[in-house]
Amino acid sequence: MDYMLNISTNITRKILETLWNYGCDLFLNEELADHVNFKLGGKVPLFAIPNSTNGFIETINLLNKEGIEFRIIGRGTNILPVDEPLPYVVVSTERMDDVFVDNEKIQVGAGLSFKKLCLVALENELSGFENAFGLPGSVGGAVYMNAGCYGWETAENIVEVVAFDGKDIIKLGKNEIGFGYRTSIFKSEKNLIILQATFKLKKGNKNEIYNLMLETMKKRYEKQPLEFPSAGSVFKRPRPDFYVGTAIESLGLKGFSIGGAQISEKHAGFIINKGGAKAEDVLKLIEYVKDKVREKYNVELETEIEIWK
């Protein structure tokens, strides 16, 4: 006899068995805190990890067919889930991590960590990701938000993205992806799910690439609070000449806390979980910073992180 795991998601035993047959690892009533860098957030009724791209597509097809709401997660580095139980299924791309190198091109699955992608480039003496080394998150997440750092953006090296639109597998060229500052078509077209990405690099000297990557990591450790759970830079830059971290620091807010959430003492653009933080603490701190920046600079800040409700 079928039972309901959660009335709001209509997940029956039959659906669970079908997902299992698709090759998914399934975790019931799973804590999202175990899957996001912030180490906080509520439970979801089901957390599914397909073991292949085909299994992933079958999973999405089934959830769509059954009318079950879902979210996609990569490495969880840019997500802030609220504290309350969330009513949707979460599907992970983490095992969609295939890599294929063809001369100066690298095709990878959306779930591959960007750090591993950088190491693949290094191993194959390909230059272009030196400033991206240590970028947290998955390839899919980087493409989704056009992640960037130290003057580099994901869009620079993208050639093509393979996506699933809920019916068909489609290919999008660079000019069709709608890249902008921390955005892409995938943010507005929620039915489009990134499966693979192809990057174009150029041949370089392995030692030079390695040394530049080390320099990038050194800068990260010196300037970012990597020793604490966080979701990276919290706010988008509202305009090219407005540095959010500098503005927050000018307000004397470095080290300011609400509950377990704190504005980093190392970089004011980061909010960290200094221990026992709730999502509510982080959200209150975000609003506090927005208010203070608005009062002093007449600038409206937007969050770079994704807030899951």
UniProtKB/Swiss-Prot annotation:
Belongs to the MurB family. Coiled coil: none annotated. Signal peptide: none annotated. Disulfide bonds: none annotated. GO terms for biological process: cell division; cell wall organization; peptidoglycan biosynthetic process; regulation of cell shape. InterPro entries: FAD-bd_PCMH, FAD-bd_PCMH-like_sf, FAD-bd_PCMH_sub1, FAD-bd_PCMH_sub2, MurB, MurB_C, MurB_C_sf, Oxid_FAD_bind_N. Pfam families: FAD_binding_4, MurB_C. Pathway: Cell wall biogenesis; peptidoglycan biosynthesis. GO terms for cellular component: cytosol. It is an enzyme of class 1 (oxidoreductase). Its cofactor is FAD. This is UDP-N-acetylenolpyruvoylglucosamine reductase. It comes from Fervidobacterium nodosum (strain ATCC 35602 / DSM 5306 / Rt17-B1). Its EC number is 1.3.1.98. Cell wall formation. Keywords: Cell cycle, Cell division, Cell shape, Cell wall biogenesis/degradation, Cytoplasm, FAD, Flavoprotein, NADP, Oxidoreductase, Peptidoglycan synthesis. It catalyses: UDP-N-acetyl-alpha-D-muramate + NADP(+) = UDP-N-acetyl-3-O-(1-carboxyvinyl)-alpha-D-glucosamine + NADPH + H(+). GO terms for molecular function: FAD binding; UDP-N-acetylmuramate dehydrogenase activity. It is found in: Cytoplasm. PROSITE patterns: FAD_PCMH (PS51387). The active site is at residues 182, 233, 304. Residues 40-204 form the FAD-binding PCMH-type domain. Gene3D superfamilies: 3.30.465.10, UDP-N-acetylenolpyruvoylglucosamine reductase, C-terminal domain, Uridine Diphospho-n-acetylenolpyruvylglucosamine Reductase, domain 2.
